[in-house]
Amino acid sequence: MMIRQRLTVVAAATALGLAVAGLAGGTAQAATAKPKPPAKSGAAASCSRARLPLPDPTCTPGAYNPAVTQATIGSTICVSGWTATVRPPASYTNALKTQQIAQYGFSDTNPADYEEDHLVPLELGGAPRDPHNLWPEPRYGSQPAQSKDQVENKLKTAVCGGRVSLAAARGAIASDWTTALSRLGL
């Protein structure tokens, strides 16, 4: 009995320590943490598909990582490999993707047909785990998910090269990634 109590106390202390470490790290969370979708009333199809290939701005308005500012881009987004340090694990994004496919009311419910994409990309300091910055972007259609990746890379290059401010790039991609480059003259 005494050993069981001691193991319970040690396990609880370890779990508490991990939770505190995850909070202290800012972007780390337990891999088993269940994602919380944006608060919406109603059931399935609470998000509109009318703006595809863009997300519903009510469900997915975008969100920023507070560690990334114009002053910190030299030590964050402009450092090669930095996004890998903040990218959420697939266990988190896959669970969120399944929830959001239902919220968007997609008739195709196969998660493989969607990329759980950051509206404001990690390359521009988008919030890594905020459900308001993530959405199930279709991998099919006239402008599939991989089309946006090229825009993200060009915007990051322009921001890191000093041709566009971080705020301008974030605003352009969040409002309409299909016109972001032309709006910024890139």
Label for each model-derived stretch:
Residues 2-115, 124-186:
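Nuclease and nuclease-like effector domains acting on nucleic acids or nucleotide cofactors
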Residues 121:
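Short active-site segment of divalent metal-dependent hydrolases/proteases
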